[in-house]
Amino acid sequence: MSIFLEALSWLATPANWLGESGILTRSAEHLGLTFLIVVLASLVALPLGTVIGHTGRGRWLVSATGAARAVPTLGVLTLAGLWLGIGLAAPTLALLVLAIPPLLSATYSGITSTPRTTVDAARAIGLTEPQILAQVEFPHAAGLIAAGVRSATLQVIATTTLAAYTANYGLGRFLYAGLKTRDYAQMIGGAIVVVALALATDALLALIARRLRTRTHSFADEENNSLKESL
């Protein structure tokens, strides 16, 4: 209990929040790297999952990346660190390996969840394959894709602490510095900040996902009615 109180005291000290190594700066670094990883992973996983889901080709890749979730991120980071050296390159690579599978799986599942009758009806009225993707399948998959983004973001925001393993970056510095100097109050305080960021981000993404699901259902109903009328 005394260590926990010391951690709260550490958090309540204004000096720990300011400066280049303060909580605010480290939090901004942490969130910035998380955002970068999710964006890069999305640029890879969303188009790939969309194409695989639409064409049915390359499904093995979804299974293979799903199996990659079992690979420990710290192990990937260690190997990447030996290869790429000190800096952000190694944690960026390791976090991409962590973030791509849930995004790819969610996108693939979302695209394939579109009723085949709806897709066939879209083809019957003359829509091209890109139009079917853009106007039918992708909007229908938006809810599941948002859930995948939420899952990937939470995993990354929790694991970005490992970036401090090879770089003086992010909230993980409080954990590693505290462990090195046996300043457990700093370690617990840093962990509390990470948890708070994760919970706040989860709440925001849950709200966005809920709204997307509502809009997706409305869009799907309107699209189905429109296709039926066209036929």
Residue ranges, per PLM feature:
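Loop-to-helix entry region at the N-terminal start of transmembrane alpha-helices
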Residues: T25-L33, G81-P102, A142, Q186, ...
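Short cytoplasmic-facing helical segments at TM-TM junctions of multi-pass membrane proteins
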Residues: A106-I145, L171, L175
